[in-house]
Amino acid sequence: MRSVLYSYILFLSCIIINGRDIAPHAPSNGKCKDNEYRSRNLCCLSCPPGTYASRLCDSKTNTQCTPCGSDTFTSHNNHLQACLSCNGRCDSNQVETRSCNTTHNRICECSPGYYCLLKGASGCRTCISKTKCGIGYGVSGYTSTGDVICSPCGPGTYSHTVSSTDKCEPVVTSNTFNYIDVEINLYPVNDTSCTRTTTTGLSESISTSELTITMNHKDCDPVFRAEYFSVLNNVATSGFFTGENRYQNTSKICTLNFEIKCNNKDSSSKQLTKTKNDTIMPHSETVTLVGDCLSSVDIYILYSNTNTQDYENDTISYHMGNVLDVNSHMPASCDIHKLITNSQNPTHL
């Protein structure tokens, strides 16, 4: 008896699931219920989410519902005659935030670093890489589609990264620098033409037929961008300087090693001693002279924080022989520039 009753209950359950327990009926006050749809002036049961109408109702039999198959879905009460196909797999620049199942479509959203250019009913259809703000610029906001807005860093702020997320940071007001100015004055020098060679991230050099000035730099965050060289009355003034967009990380020591080499057969060398060494910032220097073609050398190295009120500075100097007067010089760039790319330590010039 119990087995017969259990079978009967199971049979009734199947009928209810398939919508066959209630025959279609006429609308009440011209309306059907929320879980019904209207067909030929009859109110028929809708299929629940996750199923579709494998057989529509007629005057005697209600809707027959069948579960959705793999990669298909219905998310609302319906009388669709087939389930909807889920969206395809997410692109490489997207992440799946909801997987496809019988009641929900797959949803893909943009990965970090991307924004949605074209939205769909279920997530984003097209993701585009966000704009990256360059050195000296920071993220100041976002467009209506989610792309980055870049703005120049104002007074008292800086940025030394290329990023789609970093904002301009407040300047550290002491014990660091964002600008390096190197001045090298030499006597006697005759050749007025020069070649500048840059090995990115490693060294700068100015060479003439008489001598070569090489500056090797290590762990320096400000980027050297330009040089100058001029000769007047056998006195040469030359140098290198950086941009102002990048601050020195105080956990590192910016090291500058200079070699001034005469292009003759004399290979003797000597180290110059600092004559001024006002140091509160993270830097270190050496100067080596190779050869005997010069009788006077002046070197001035200025490390500056250009965003402080009076320019906080460290000044380093080296001297040999007479102090040279270069006030009448008109510095100019070298005639030839050569760039050697160092793939292990790339730096934007």
Swiss-Prot record:
Induction record: Expressed in the early phase of the viral replicative cycle.
Entry's Gene Ontology molecular function annotations: tumor necrosis factor binding; tumor necrosis factor receptor activity
TNFR-Cys repeats: 31-65, 67-108
Cysteines joined through disulfide linkages: 32-43, 44-57, 47-65, 68-83, 86-100, 90-108
Glycosylated residues, chain numbering: 101, 190, 249, 277, 313
Keywords of this entry: Disulfide bond, Glycoprotein, Repeat, Secreted, Signal
InterPro entries per UniProt: Poxvirus_TNF-rcpt-II_C, Poxvirus_TNF_rcpt-II, TNF_chemokine_rcpt-like, TNFR/NGFR_Cys_rich_reg, TNFRSF_N_viral
GO cellular component, one term: extracellular region
Alphabetized Pfam families for the sequence: CrmD_SECRET, TNFR_c6
Gene Ontology biological-process entries: positive regulation of membrane protein ectodomain proteolysis; regulation of T cell proliferation; symbiont-mediated perturbation of host defense response
Signal peptide: 1-19
Intracellular or extracellular location(s): Secreted
Record-stated family: Belongs to the orthopoxvirus OPG002 family.
Record function comment: Inhibits host immune defense by binding to host TNF and various chemokines in the extracellular space. Binds host CC chemokines (beta chemokines) and CXC chemokines (alpha chemokines).
Name listed for the protein in its UniProt record: Soluble TNF receptor II
Name of the gene: OPG002
